[in-house]
Amino acid sequence: MRASKYLIATYKETPADAEVISHQLMLRAGLIRKLASGLYNWLPAGLRVLRKVETIVREEMDRAGAQEVLMPVVQPAELWEESGRWQQYGPELLRINDRHDRAFCLGPTHEEVITDLIRNELKSYKQLPANFYQIQTKFRDEVRPRFGVMRAREFLMKDAYSFHASQECLQETYDIMHAAYCKIFDRIGLDYRPVLADTGSIGGTGSHEFHVLADSGEDDIAFSTESNFAANVELAEALAPAKQTAEPLPREEVATPNVKTIEDVAKLLDVPTTQTVKTLIVKGVENEDGKHTLVALVLRGDHALNDIKAIKLAHVANPLEFADESGIKAAVGAEVGSLGPIGLSMPVYVDRAAAALVNFVCGANKDGYHYTNANWSDAAEHKVVDIRNVVIGDPSPCGKGTIDIKRGIEVGHIFQLGTKYSEAMKASVLDENGKDKTMIMGCYGIGVSRIVASAIEQNYDDNGIIWPDAIAPFHVAIVPINMQKSEAVAQKCEELYAQLNQLGYDVLLMDEPKARLGGMLADTELMGIPHRIVVGDRGLEKGQLEYKCRRDSDSQDIAVDDIIEFINNAVKTGK
């Protein structure tokens, strides 16, 4: 591609409304332009990157045995009503009516459509397993679109759906798709982790997320320092610590006026927060009168409640909701800052770490008072459970090493859906006995457009993007010095351009007549082109060309006759 005939829409200024580096650089490098909140135009350079990601995804899906289909973005409400999600999904589902007042939605996902398609096409267990995928635009009406294409309302996604006659068959395909996802992210060149995850609104049983590690990530990923274990913090098990061995001391009630927080209590009583417990009162399941009961959740003072773990408890309402202050006061006789586990007349769940304490500090269920030297023999009947988030340094649940936590950007998610949709929508085949058998489903998603932004979050410096070779808009930039005035420079540039193109490289020849050398060099850095060749008269007189790898700070001189072989090796090694 010649720069003189190509839209290079770079600019120097950092947009004021771009919060994360990927959004800033995608705008500055001329990859995207904002159309409206959460909606973006993809410019030529950006689309090149997007298509390369798409190609890698498509190749690995084909290799995994999935068949490509294409389903409509606009979906009839009837299918969503049939699955039960028309009302459940919430405002993220953009609902529309056509001219005949028939209800539709813009698809945020395609479980209903694929289930409807396959229930009409597959008739026998002999046709299973079957795996279908598409690369299609999705729309989710995010309440607050942000971070550019990272959390846009309209985005490009690869979603695949598999159909099976048995759980064992689903597991086989699930493992194949898991491996395919790893291959995709390996080929792109991302630092990622597959992690155990919650199924969320999609539903189902087993689930893994694929996270690109980046400081700007919105999710906390817990992983072992000595094994491959990794899980979303929400799902990582917090193992029970050894019980403290101190002898129980007599419990004392002490005045703690105007003290509401764990930190303030610990400071006033001169104890570490690790020797305190906090009691959270949440809404429980409804009683016979249709009113919410109350449930107490007790944690060590320095630990945070894990909502996902909490809602799995028998007495806790879903979604998790804290009880209002008036209800707490009426039930316990004290305000939030003075609550404790002793003397409660409601279900009490105590986290493992809190249960290991001896002689701890807790609220006395009396405004302005706490207990010191409290012990679990004093407390109401309770059940010991895991309801906290893991923290750095915790022993890993796998038994190897300790927990480290990093931020991650979710770029893929795979689910074992089971029969959630096939049962609701009566998607079945005839089994070997001629009887109806509900198909078991798997679901596999990758955020194609999100991968582009995620790759930037891992690969940039002060000068711009540093693309991995596999998805760079161009592999090589040829930058001439005074091409319009030097026949030798022009000839060598054209020669290199032809040779590299013939070898299958995407090449950008910076042949814009009025462009300055400094501006051209800055643009190639900003756009993240991995390999750059500068052609000038001085170098040619010495039989040399200046080469610079985008990842390196310094350039080097390469013999003219060796440059093609050098580029071949550089692209192969990524250096």
UniProtKB/Swiss-Prot annotation:
Keyword annotations from UniProtKB, A to Z: Aminoacyl-tRNA synthetase, ATP-binding, Cytoplasm, Ligase, Nucleotide-binding, Protein biosynthesis
Pfam families (UniProt xref): HGTP_anticodon, tRNA-synt_2b, tRNA_edit
EC number: 6.1.1.15
GO biological process: prolyl-tRNA aminoacylation
Molecular function in Gene Ontology: aminoacyl-tRNA deacylase activity; ATP binding; proline-tRNA ligase activity
Annotated catalysed reactions: tRNA(Pro) + L-proline + ATP = L-prolyl-tRNA(Pro) + AMP + diphosphate
Recorded superkingdom: Bacteria
GO cellular component, as recorded: cytosol
InterPro entries in the cross-refs: aa-tRNA-synt_IIb, aa-tRNA-synth_II, aa-tRNA-synth_II/BPL/LPL, Anticodon-bd, Anticodon-bd_dom_sf, Pro-tRNA-ligase_IIa, Pro-tRNA-synth_IIa_bac-type, Pro-tRNA-Synthase_IIa_type1
Enzyme class, spelled out: ligase
UniProt-listed CDD domains: ProRS-INS (cd04334), ProRS_anticodon_short (cd00861), ProRS_core_prok (cd00779)
Localization per Swiss-Prot or TrEMBL: Cytoplasm
Similarity comment: Belongs to the class-II aminoacyl-tRNA synthetase family. ProS type 1 subfamily.
Role this protein plays: Catalyzes the attachment of proline to tRNA(Pro) in a two-step reaction: proline is first activated by ATP to form Pro-AMP and then transferred to the acceptor end of tRNA(Pro). As ProRS can inadvertently accommodate and process non-cognate amino acids such as alanine and cysteine, to avoid such errors it has two additional distinct editing activities against alanine. One activity is designated as 'pretransfer' editing and involves the tRNA(Pro)-independent hydrolysis of activated Ala-AMP.
Alphabetized PANTHER family for the sequence: MITOCHONDRIAL RIBOSOME PROTEIN L39/PROLYL-TRNA LIGASE FAMILY MEMBER, PROLINE--TRNA LIGASE
NCBIfam families: PRK09194.1 (NF006625), proS_fam_II (TIGR00409)
Quaternary structure annotation from Swiss-Prot or TrEMBL: Homodimer.
Annotated domain remarks: Consists of three domains: the N-terminal catalytic domain, the editing domain and the C-terminal anticodon-binding domain.
Name of protein: Proline--tRNA ligase
Species the sequence originates in: Saccharophagus degradans (strain 2-40 / ATCC 43961 / DSM 17024)
Lineage: Bacteria, Pseudomonadati, Pseudomonadota, Gammaproteobacteria, Cellvibrionales
Gene: proS
